[in-house]
Amino acid sequence: MYRYEISNYAKPGFACRHNDGYWTGVWYAGFGLGASSLLNHTRYRNTEHMEEYLTAAPEQLAGYREAEPLTQNDEMEEFMFLGLRRMAGVSESEFKKRFRRTIREVYGEIPDSLIRHGLLARKGDRYFLTPEGMNLSNYVMSEFILISSEQQQKHRTD
């Protein structure tokens, strides 16, 4: 068995390909009560109530109740913290291809600081968690949450 994701192990050739789509940001459609979808930069969530689901207007996406448009910051955050769950980590070139900015342009010194503290490593194009980084993964991933200037201002005045 080998570890292919922070909380998943598998025999060679048996890693879950289904979940890999979530961790790499592939768009997906969910059907049924309480299902979630990620389509066209929007996260959808279906109702959990059968009656509401069955009587949904035809123009609704299979009875969705919530639609949350994702900002580019939302998508960059998810790219980083979902990608860092995987032992393969995140690719600098894939980040740049997807967002037209480098990880350093977006996150400044954060990756280098995490590397200096032994929580993150870089090999070639990829950043990935070290064994100690896996133990402190919530902290590491929280470092990749982008705070808008409005949130920063509110935080300063609170």
Can you name each region flagged by the protein language model?
Residues 126-130:
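Minor-groove-contacting beta-hairpin "wing" of winged helix-turn-helix DNA-binding domains
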Residues 115-125:
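A short, conserved structural fragment
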Residues 51, 74-81, 108, 134, ...:
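Non-catalytic, well-ordered alpha-helical scaffold segments
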Residues 1-101, 151-158:
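C-terminal scaffold of the Radical SAM
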Residues 15-19, 117-118, 135:
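Short secondary-structure transition/capping segments
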Residues 132-158:
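Short, amphipathic alpha-helical interaction segments positioned at domain boundaries
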